[in-house]
Amino acid sequence: MNLRLELTRFLNLCFALASAFMFWKGLSIVTNSHSPIVVVLSGSMEPAFQRGDILFLWNRNELNKVGDVVVYEVDNKEIPIVHRVLREHVDETSGKQLLLTKGDNNAGNDIPLYAKRKIYLHKEKDIVGTVKGYIPQLGYITIWISENKYAKMGLMGLIALSALLSNE
């Protein structure tokens, strides 16, 4: 085993991982969103967005309008929610924008999804970003990998095997 070759492979892997991380962080800074790309996980926004669509977010707009599709996070829930702004207003005391949302495919608004005793989302605190573009169905790959433990193990095995067999 050539130590220099193995060290070069390891450093190339570290460089690739660091580059991907820097790209993600750079995109986060440009979009002002800690998660600038998300995958739709449910059918609550059909027909506008299907399960598996990849959404690109932007969070530099000052105010959201009724009809905007936003991604928001709720306290104590890990998965962000993609829904449309149903109603908006500015709180007179704080000057902050408050939003009420609803999934296009849902019967009622999202108040039951919000934290206890909360009837509006705070733009600055709860909104991850506004949807500015999407790629249909490409996110199914991530859904399939996350929901299928054998797919995870197979992918990890494939990565390990390719690292072991590479002759560069």
Swiss-Prot record:
CDD domains to which the protein is assigned, alphabetical: Peptidase_S24_S26 (cd06462)
Source species, domain of life: Eukaryota
TM helices/strands, residue ranges: 13-30
Matches recorded under PROSITE patterns: SPASE_I_1
Cellular compartments per GO CC: signal peptidase complex
Membrane-protein topology: Single-pass type II membrane protein
Keywords recorded for this protein, A-Z: Endoplasmic reticulum, Hydrolase, Membrane, Protease, Signal-anchor, Transmembrane, Transmembrane helix
A single GO BP: signal peptide processing
Chemical reaction(s) catalysed: Cleavage of hydrophobic, N-terminal signal or leader sequences from secreted and periplasmic proteins
Topological domain spans for side Cytoplasmic: 1-12
Active site (record annotation): S44 (charge relay system), H83 (charge relay system), D110 (charge relay system)
Region (C-terminal short (CTS) helix): 154-165
Stated family: Belongs to the peptidase S26B family.
Role of this protein: Catalytic component of the signal peptidase complex (SPC) which catalyzes the cleavage of N-terminal signal sequences from nascent proteins as they are translocated into the lumen of the endoplasmic reticulum. Specifically cleaves N-terminal signal peptides that contain a hydrophobic alpha-helix (h-region) shorter than 18-20 amino acids.
Domain notes: The C-terminal short (CTS) helix is essential for catalytic activity. It may be accommodated as a transmembrane helix in the thinned membrane environment of the complex, similarly to the signal peptide in the complex substrates.
Name this polypeptide is given: Signal peptidase complex catalytic subunit SEC11
Species name: Lachancea thermotolerans (strain ATCC 56472 / CBS 6340 / NRRL Y-8284)
